[in-house]
């Protein structure tokens, strides 16, 4: 009679080994850290994004992808076997400027609005799959500010406009009573936004010699733009009509006097001629 064969412990041993292997892979993956840093750069300049893999195990390949609504888009890869491979869409626009498998950087030669967004760096690790990090690029345009004022018939307009990316905010300092404020914004195709704020002063004479400050809030900083109000020209419609009427009257009187004088001279000359003929 043959002795029985026990297979159950072997199954348990295989299961335990598999579990230990999975745990080891998970532990090694969990210990891998990807360090990234978001960047804010001036539009139409050079910008770089960097990823660092904190591990002693060197990955096989590094891939950079751009995050999009429809899914990530491959941009460029680097490996020791194939070097740098740039996708056709991104040729002449970007390159990997730090050739490494643990530290990698991509550089945009001349940033455009399409380059703004978030990017993933993927490290393909042997035995533990892919490890990724995300770095975001934000583009800005420095504000261009204009501050001026105009006098009208019965009020004064003080206008402050700022154009920038992202959109700036405008506030006023040094204003008094009897002043109305209106603000509007307009987006441009180049990615900038213009914000215009107008102060309407009902009694301009009260603001002569005073300093008005337009405060532009941009990226957490407040910049003051100052304007001193000089004496302007105030007039009303009745006063203007009176002045014009007076000028017209003076012109008519001058014409009438000139005509009378010229007529008297002609009469005098004709009477003298008749006396000589006699």
From Swiss-Prot:
One of its GO terms (biological process) is negative regulation of neuroinflammatory response. GO terms for cellular component: axon; cell body; cell surface; neuron projection; neuronal cell body; plasma membrane; postsynaptic density; presynaptic active zone. PROSITE patterns: IG_LIKE. Residues 31-141 form the Ig-like V-type domain. Residues 31-232 are extracellular. SUPFAM superfamilies: Immunoglobulin (SSF48726). Its main location: membrane. Found on the surface of neurons, thymocytes, B-cells and follicular dendritic cells. InterPro entries: CD200_Ig_V_dom (IPR033321), Ig-like_dom (IPR007110), Ig-like_dom_sf (IPR036179), Ig-like_fold (IPR013783), Ig_sub (IPR003599), Ig_V-set (IPR013106), Immunoglobulin_dom (IPR013151), OX2G-like (IPR047164). It comes from the Eukaryota. CDD domains: IgV_1_MRC-OX-2_like. It is a single-pass type I membrane protein. The chain crosses the membrane at residues 233-259. It is found in: Cell membrane. The keyword Disulfide bond applies. Residues 142-232 form the Ig-like C2-type domain. Glycans are attached at residues 95, 103, 110, 157, 181, 190. One of its GO terms (molecular function) is protein binding involved in heterotypic cell-cell adhesion. Keywords: Cell membrane, Disulfide bond, Glycoprotein, Immunoglobulin domain, Membrane, Signal, Transmembrane, Transmembrane helix. Disulfide bonds join 51-121, 118-136, 160-214. Residues 260-278 are cytoplasmic. Residues 1-30 form the signal peptide. CD200 and CD200R1 interact via their respective N-terminal Ig-like domains. Costimulates T-cell proliferation. May regulate myeloid cell activity in a variety of tissues. This is OX-2 membrane glycoprotein. The lineage of its organism: Eukaryota, Metazoa, Chordata, Craniata, Vertebrata. The gene is Cd200.
